[in-house]
Amino acid sequence: GFNENLLNDAINLALNSETLWPYDLGAANNIPGLTDIEPEPWNRILGPLKPRGGPSGLLVYKGYIAAKWGDPTRVDMTFSIAKSYFSVLTGIAVQDGLIDSVDTPVATTLRDKTVSSYFRSDQNRGITWEHLLHQTSEWEGTLFDKPDQVDHFREVGPGSINTRKGSKRKLQKPGTFWEYNDVRVNLLGLALLSLFKRPLSDVLRERVMAPIGASDTWSWHGYENSWVDIDGEQMQSVPGGTHWGGGIQISTFDHARFGLLVHRRG
């Protein structure tokens, strides 16, 4: 069991640690700490933004809900947690034989000429799936009007200083340098789309979310300019976050189901 007083202290800490971000990012037309410090046109919002609610959360212990606060059924934007969904989808691609190994170069895996063109340069042809997953790809290029340079020198976490963010730096060999770069993460999403040849939200719903009993309230939004031709059909590539809008909008309950799946190793 839990110490009720300590449990209540933890819940109160969560309730009192609400973000200072505006409730309506669409009205603000920027993402604090990201697009508000980026120059035009790199800072342009490309995907939908949804007004947020207050703090909500769950404490799950041994598969049971031990505590909850706020409204865990409310659907909110959830930013970089989308990267975890990319990881699981990559695992499914390996399981289905679409990727031989995460150590395989992406360039040798993709059959779509348009998508594979992003990996043809000397800098990019040695990038593996693991590099994309670990954010060590050092990919160079522009995707959906966003250059990789926009996140050069980006810092994340408490105490981050981003005065150099977006300044050009010398690229390293893929696999040797880590950088939190959303353009490169979004490239992983496009590469997965070209493998599955289906919208990633459809694959996620069919292979993961429906089997674990998730609701039908979640959605995964792309950018206005992220539509691509896959075997003659227009499909929208989705991002691994909400840096420029879009991304996964989902409830706390559904996130918890997904988290429990990962905790139990699938």
Predicted regions and their residues:
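N-terminal leader/targeting segments and the immediately adjacent pre-domain N-terminus
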Residues: 1-71, 96-99, 194, 198
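Solvent-exposed, acidic/flexible segments
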Residues: 4-7, 52-53, 75-82, 99, ...
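Surface-exposed intrinsically disordered loops and tails
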Residues: 26-45, 158-171, 224-241
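Active-site-adjacent loops and short helices of periplasmic peptidoglycan-processing enzymes
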Residues: 45-55, 79, 92-136
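Active-site SXXK
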Residues: 63, 77-102, 132, 188-192, ...
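A generic structural motif
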Residues: 72-73, 265
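Active-site-adjacent helix/loop patches that line small-molecule binding or acyl-intermediate pockets
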Residues: 107-112, 118-217, 253-256, 260-264
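Penicillin-binding protein/beta-lactamase superfamily catalytic region
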Residues: 176-178, 202, 222-266
